[in-house]
């Protein structure tokens, strides 16, 4: 009698276990596409992307290389080159000459910032299997190199031809706030003028924000990022005349990038 009871109990347990296994297998059988999509996301461990970055004091280009630590965490290498303008910059034109070129009055240097950093990106919300947006947050830190190029302008000089006749002559000169004013500045000179006098200011930067991935496929990247960046320089950078030199730049940014995931 006891043996029969034990046999029945074992049969019932085996039956229940079989039903449970079947129930666990059904989601993968019925949703094979979902399973394959998540499998691809895990298997593709590397990525590379590039794009443009717009920030509150200029614009530039950026590149990122990433590698998954796991499904929820990613290591990032971050590179960017941006120009950095002063909020006090105002472009003006000499009103006495019809072909005069605009320039930023009072600007001493054109400033560019080259960044290279390392950080992490973490998953907040993944895409549904039918598509959508993947949301992550990131934090990055690294080396920031400020580069200041002196501003050159075309200056109007009066040349005496006779006691009652003068002629205008244009010369290209480095901007000097004590010598150059709105009435004798004709306009900006060639952009490349002054690169041989470039000065370098080493520093550091930090970058935080959110990443929105709109890519329809796991192999492609269509990314939008929003966040903030701070660049700090031990030696301050002169940007505008009669203003304090800049020890740091704090900017808000928006970037759009495209790329691919691979192994």
Predicted features along the sequence, with ranges:
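Short glycine/proline- and aromatic-enriched beta-strand/turn motifs that initiate or cap beta-hairpins
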Residues: 24-80
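Flexible, solvent-exposed coil segments and beta strand-coil junctions
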Residues: 37-45, 91-102, 182-191, 232-235
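Short loop/turn motifs that connect adjacent beta-strands in outer-membrane beta-barrel proteins
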Residues: 40-46, 68-76, 108, 125-135, ...
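Residues on the lipid-exposed face of transmembrane beta-strands in outer-membrane beta-barrel proteins
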Residues: 52, 61-67, 116-122, 141-145, ...
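Outer-membrane beta-barrel translocator/channel fold
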Residues: 81-115, 119-130
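Outer-membrane beta-barrel transmembrane domain signature
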Residues: 140-225, 229-245, 258-262
């Amino acid at each position: 009698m006891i043996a029969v009871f034990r046999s029945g109990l074992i049969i019932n347990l085996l039956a229940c276990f079989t039903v449970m296994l079947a129930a666990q297998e059904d989601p993968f059988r019925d949703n094979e596409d979902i399973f394959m999509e998540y499998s691809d996301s895990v298997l593709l461990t590397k990525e590379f992307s590039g794009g443009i970055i717009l920030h509150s004091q200029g614009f530039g280009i950026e590149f990122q290389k990433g590698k998954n630590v796991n499904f929820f965490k990613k290591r990032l290498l971050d590179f960017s080159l941006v120009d950095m303008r002063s909020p006090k910059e105002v472009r003006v034109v000499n009103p006495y000459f019809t072909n005069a070129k605009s320039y930023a009055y009072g600007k001493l240097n054109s400033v560019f910032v080259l960044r290279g950093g390392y950080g992490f990106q973490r998953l907040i919300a993944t895409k549904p299997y039918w598509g959508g947006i993947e949301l992550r947050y990131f934090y990055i830190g690294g080396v920031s190199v400020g580069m200041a190029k002196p501003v050159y302008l075309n200056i109007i000089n009066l040349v005496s031809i006779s006691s009652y006749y003068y002629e205008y002559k244009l010369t290209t000169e480095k901007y000097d706030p004590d010598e150059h004013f709105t009435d004798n500045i004709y306009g900006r000179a060639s952009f490349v003028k002054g690169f041989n006098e470039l000065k370098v200011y080493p520093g550091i930067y930090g970058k935080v924000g959110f990443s929105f991935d709109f890519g329809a496929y796991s192999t492609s990247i269509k990314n939008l990022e929003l966040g903030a960046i701070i660049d700090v320089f031990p030696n301050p950078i002169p940007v505008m005349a009669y203003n304090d030199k800049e020890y740091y730049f704090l900017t808000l940014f928006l970037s759009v990038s495209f790329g691919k995931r691979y192994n």
